[in-house]
Amino acid sequence: MGKGGGRDKYEPAAISEHGNKKKAKKERDMDELKKEVSMDDHKLSLDELQRKYGTDLSRGLTTARAAEILARDGPNALTPPPTTPEWVKFCRQLFGGFSMLLWIGAILCFLAYGIQAATEEEPQNDNLYLGVVLSAVVIITGCFSYYQEAKSSKIMESFKNMVPQQALVVRNGEKMSINAEEVVVGDLVEVKGGDRIPADLRIISANGCKVDNSSLTGESEPQTRSPDFTNENPLETRNIAFFSTNCVEGTARGIVVYTGDRTVMGRIATLASGLEGGQTPIAAEIEHFIHIITGVAVFLGVTFFILSLILEYTWLEAVIFLIGIIVANVPEGLLATVTVCLTLTAKRMARKNCLVKNLEAVETLGSTSTICSDKTGTLTQNRMTVAHMWFDNQIHEADTTENQSGVSFDKTSATWLSLSRIAGLCNRAVFQANQENIPILKRAVAGDASESALLKCIELCCGSVKEMRDRYPKIVEIPFNSTNKYQLSIHKNPNTSEPQHLLVMKGAPERILDRCSSILLNGKEQPLDEELKDAFQNAYLELGGLGERVLGFCHLFLPDEQFPEGFQFDTDDVNFPLENLCFVGLISMIDPPRAAVPDAVGKCRSAGIKVIMVTGDHPITAKAIAKGVGIISEGNETVEDIAARLNIPVSQVNPRDAKACVVHGSDLKDMTPEQLDDILRHHTEIVFARTSPQQKLIIVEGCQRQGAIVAVTGDGVNDSPALKKADIGVAMGIAGSDVSKQAADMILLDDNFASIVTGVEEGRLIFDNLKKSIAYTLTSNIPEITPFLIFIIANIPLPLGTVTILCIDLGTDMVPAISLAYEQAESDIMKRQPRNPQTDKLVNERLISMAYGQIGMIQALGGFFTYFVILAENGFLPIHLLGLRVDWDDRWVNDVEDSYGQQWTYEQRKIVEFTCHTAFFVSIVVVQWADLVICKTRRNSVFQQGMKNKILIFGLFEETALAAFLSYCPGMGVALRMYPLKPTWWFCAFPYSLLIFVYDEVRKLIIRRRPGGWVEKETYY
């Protein structure tokens, strides 16, 4: 990049340039993440390496030089991602989204009070109260949300490893253990099995060293490390060990080539933490909703402002009306309701092992339409398990279930006894100490994955392997290496009827078979003829085709005359036979699917969610697991399957004929975005195998280009860019790395894919329930606003006061609205397609038309009916009320006449008016009963859904009790200007309540009977 030579030309545009720079940097970072790692230290010879880093390959750096480098480069640690200061987080909760609307309302109230105080001698304090209450609501709910998020981030903090890592370095020719943060470039470092690699190392000597690279490359098998340069790609070559991967076995020495943020791991972490996650769908929905509500409020306010001027009110009165209408339109209680709904769901999910870091992420999961899932540990159990054996010329199935409830096989065969003996003896894995009381499958093992699988299998089937090894003491062994691909050991044989030395060997099946001349069948040795070789080949191909890792086993009794007791076996200059052995059988292993996964994948499919597997593993294994868990469903073929069935080359098959598709990482590398889009569009079932972490990011972007809302699961550092880019990143709590947990929005505490599906269901439920809650809350807006409008137009005494509106929004409506968050899912929740964020909004025109235009209008009628009844009982017939307002509200007029000629003083009139306010308020509570019950469902009948929601039933009683308390409690006349009512006045609104219930049940019945009809199109929100 240039050094900014053309800077002076653009001086005036500095501001926009800053924005563009930020954007350009974001795009640059994104491209950086998609690039493969570039470094050349693995290609250097040892001399060049020594010169480049100014170090000594045997004595290491001097202490003084190391101190200089540490001062220059800084500590060997990852820079923590930039955190948002707490006060900023708090302000976001106080002034973000919905809160802003309430703040504006509060300011308008204070403004109105100011105008009244300046112009009237005894101003009413309504607007002052209203402003104070609105401010209080925002502050309380803001604190509540802030507290919730702070709680989640506390749990996050606890994940961080508190133990400072140590590293063994050679300085001044002496070994010393130092804090890993003090390791510098050029240091000579020693690592052994069990250590975490402290920085990026170039290996200069190694002894049987293997590292677990799964968190970086996704390879589940431990990778050998040696001084040899074996691959151009630094991630694949054997002579580089990466920062924060673990050394599983063996020892190695290496020179530090990168530290801290400059390591491969550090680069990914830094770039990922810089990626911006977009706005969550629910935040966008709430913003959309605020626009609608504000639009309606301002439209009504301005309309009536103009109308009141036409009706010859003064300017000041018109402004007060304007503010009153805007404030009456703001659903004050809704902010608290939304926060509580999200919090409840987050708590519910925590109980089901999902930790939600960001409350809004809960809903995002519900609108997910594509899940890109890792294979190892998420879909599978993350432990190699013996799946099949082949002996006595047939395949036997082993039990791969997590609780050993599956199939078993014939364990009495003499061949099985020989096979299990070889698998137990020719095996370096051991159980760690003091685990006698732990179930065998759960025990910790020292050794590599395949050997642990064999150890556990033999321990389950044949009893203690340790006792077997004690009976057959090991004399010598040749460990497995990649050139001869076998492992061999010779043991003392306790059985007196057989020769006293037993040689056992295991390794790559074809290599083992080449060394055999006979085969064991039903305990008898037979010559290995072509027919049996074919049988072996078929079994090997069948097990390999299942994606299993197959090992061959053979043995040989060494004749006593050649190998008497005390014979000195030599493994360097081999003095015992390695040919003409006796083949015993095959054992194949796989990392089996978790028990709950196939069902979870099935649920995703019926919920219209596409599950894509993305793994670093081999295509055959990936495809086998995909078939095992139902990501590739039965009967669906890939291009290769079709080619094999029709016996034609793959190039002749039309890719559109194949529903399923397995894409190899190396093919993905050469694809254009258009080709990737084509695959994502035309195949319903996709597996990406042998992918690099960078490609995971490309796949996520591809899905998002299709308009999908993408959830990604991952546990490695390599997954963090994809986790950050996805609409919702899901990290693993047990196997996950710290970096991936920081990048994710949600953490699965049990690493189980099935928990994601629970999350999807909860996410959809929260969206449904928020809709219901909003529909319920908005409905009462109409009976709150119409009295005000009629008051302006028809000049009648005010039917409902500001204070009473607050009692509804923040009093009686609060608990019922929140209780809808506890409503159970309707029966079709996981059978629907995912919602389309473009068209299916949280608040749409249909919801507004139902709440405002239909149910709200019936409620307003109920309120007005009560109002007219009370005034008529007091002598003011409806016709007499028109135009009465001017005299009614004039405190100096004490002789207003009613329909019967009686005169009313100002005080008497006001008591009747406030009684009307109270009655109108009670009527709204009564019609809200029916509204609450109908809001329980959107499609099902309330009778189908039932009244199992105890909180909702409590809500009904609570709002009624509160209304009664406000009406009958002594002293309310002074405090809130609410007066006691005659019992009969409670019943005025009952018919309207019943009408609402019947009207809505009929509407839902028509929707169920005529799906897609006009009733559904016009009223189904």
From Swiss-Prot:
This is Sodium/potassium-transporting ATPase subunit alpha-1. The modification N6-succinyllysine is found at residue 659. NCBIfam families: ATPase-IIC_X-K, ATPase_P-type. It comes from the Eukaryota. GO terms for cellular component: axon; basolateral plasma membrane; melanosome; membrane; plasma membrane; sarcolemma; sodium:potassium-exchanging ATPase complex. This is the catalytic component of the active enzyme, which catalyzes the hydrolysis of ATP coupled with the exchange of sodium and potassium ions across the plasma membrane. This action creates the electrochemical gradient of sodium and potassium ions, providing the energy for active transport of various nutrients. Could also be part of an osmosensory signaling pathway that senses body-fluid sodium levels and controls salt intake behavior as well as voluntary water intake to regulate sodium homeostasis. Keywords: Acetylation, ATP-binding, Cell membrane, Cell projection, Ion transport, Magnesium, Membrane, Metal-binding, Nucleotide-binding, Phosphoprotein, Potassium, Potassium transport, Sodium, Sodium transport, Sodium/potassium transport, Translocase, Transmembrane, Transmembrane helix, Transport. Its EC number is 7.2.2.13. Residues 80-82 are annotated as: Phosphoinositide-3 kinase binding. Residues 1-37, 214-233 are annotated as: Disordered. The gene is ATP1A1. One of its GO terms (biological process) is intracellular potassium ion homeostasis. The modification Phosphotyrosine is found at residues 10, 258, 540.
